Amino acid sequence: GLGDVYKRQFVRGIPVDNLYEDQDTEEVYNRLLYAASRQLFALVVGDAGTGKTTALRRLKSVLDGQDYTVLYLSESKLTPRHFYNGLLEQLGCETRFYRGDARNLLHHEIEIMRGVGHRKLVVIVDEGHLLSKEMLEEIRFLLNYKMDSENPLALILAGQTELWEKLRLQAYRAILHRVDIQCFLMPYEYAQTKAYIEKQLTYAGHPNAIFSEDAMKAVHSFSSGIPRPVSYTHL
């Protein structure tokens, strides 16, 4: 039945090739791709459910097949030591107890990766709005380590709107000034919500219209144009 259709497709885990795309999502994706290729610091901001993690999934899936190593961290209580050791673990390295030792080892591994493996590092940190000032300062400190006059890595920091509000405060101004690219994910207009639903249904094997225009408008109104609630709305 119709409920089964929703349960089957409006869930996480849809292959990246089948994700909904439009001009806005494409612009965010291209900005992130540019940040990765140029080893820049990018900020991705949007309310819960607006597609931050989806955008990051798409980026990672594309970069993984190229000359990049992509590392992903998402932890609300992230400390500088856990940050470095989390990255080292993903690189297959032994962790270090002291922050400075872990940082130095990471820099060493990055130099090998770039010089010998000819690979660029992309670090994605999700849930950035939950990070402490100490952790955000550590990110800036990491980026200040220069190799060949380039950044040692691309860093993509994603979080809810509170992250942007925090970075605009005077106490965080030095971090904000370090940001190279800003991406803001906004709720969908009605036409985008409709296209999003149709894309999901096509992936589910239902290319024909099964929702009325009024039903789609009701979904858009209920969800306020935010993709995640659309995905879990049962009509």
PLM features per residue range, with description:
Residues 131-132, 143-171:
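Sensor-1/coupling segment of RecA-like P-loop NTPase cores
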Residues 41-57:
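Walker A/P-loop nucleotide-binding motif
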Residues 65-75:
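Conserved catalytic segments around the Walker B and adjacent sensor/switch elements
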Residues 112-116, 147, 165-227:
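Helix-loop-helix "sensor" segment of P-loop NTPases
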Residues 113-133:
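Conserved P-loop NTPase "ATPase switch" module shared by AAA+ and STAND
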Residues 25-35:
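Pre-Walker A adenine-sensing motif
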Residues 1-9, 233-234:
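Conserved small/polar residues in nucleotide/adenosyl-binding loops
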Residues 9, 68, 78-97:
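Conserved NTP-binding/hydrolysis module of P-loop NTPases
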